[in-house]
Amino acid sequence: MPEVTGVDPLDLLHRRATPEHDGIPGTFSLRPLDLDRDLDLLHTWMNDPEVARYWNKAWPREQIASYLREQQLSTHSTPYVGELDDVPMSYWELYRADLDPLAQYYDAREHDAGVHLLLGPADSRGRRLAADLLRVVSAWQLDADPLATRVIGEPDATNERLIRVAALAGFRHVTDIELPHKRAALLVRGRDSL
C-alpha cells in the first residue's frame, strides 16, 4: 500500500471541537504532552483509584515520568493532553495500532489507528463527555490518515463503563483478546460510523 507523504497521522494539533459543531460543553483541543508542565497532573490522575483500577499505573512520580518519556520517544505513538476551554482534563495516547505490539493479538490492518483515553478530574467523568470526546478524537484520527480505515481500542474487558462509552462514540465490541497484562475488549470504529 503506498504511503501518503506530507501527512502525519499522529499530528492532531490545530483541531478544535466546539459546542456548536460537536456537542462538547466548551472548546476542546489537544496539545502535546509537556513533561515539565504536565508530570504532576498526570501523576495525580494516574494515582486516582478509579483511573488506577484500569490503567494500572498508580506509581511514584519518577516511574510515571519514565513511562511518559517512553511515550514521547515512541515512533508510533504520540501522547497528548486534552484541554476543555484551555484547562487540562484528559490524557490521550494516539498511536498506529498496526505498528504496536498489540498487532500480534488481533487481525491488524495496515494504518489501523489506536487510542487510549484517560479523563483526569473526577468531575470530567460521566455526563457523556467521554463518549463525545472519543467520537471527536477518533474522527480526527481517521481524517488525519486517509489510509486508515478504522480506530482500535482495547480497554480492560471488565471496564464495562468504558465499553458503553465507546459504543456511544461509534465503536463496536468485536471480541475479547488475551494480552500479556489483561483480557481486553477489542473495540473498532470504522469510517462507516463517521
PLM regions: where:
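Acyl-donor (CoA/ACP) binding surface of acyl/acetyltransferases
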Residues: 1-6, 10, 21, 38-39, ...
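Short, contiguous pre-domain boundary segments
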Residues: 19-27
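A short beta-loop-alpha structural element at the N-terminal edge
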Residues: 29-40
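An amphipathic alpha-helix signature
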Residues: 39-43, 65
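Helix-loop element at the rim of GNAT/NAT acetyltransferase active sites that forms part
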Residues: 44-58
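Active-site rim helix/loop that mediates acceptor-substrate recognition in acyltransferases
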Residues: 58-79
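A short glycine-rich, hydrophobically flanked beta-strand micro-motif that places a catalytic Asp/Glu
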Residues: 78-81, 151-153
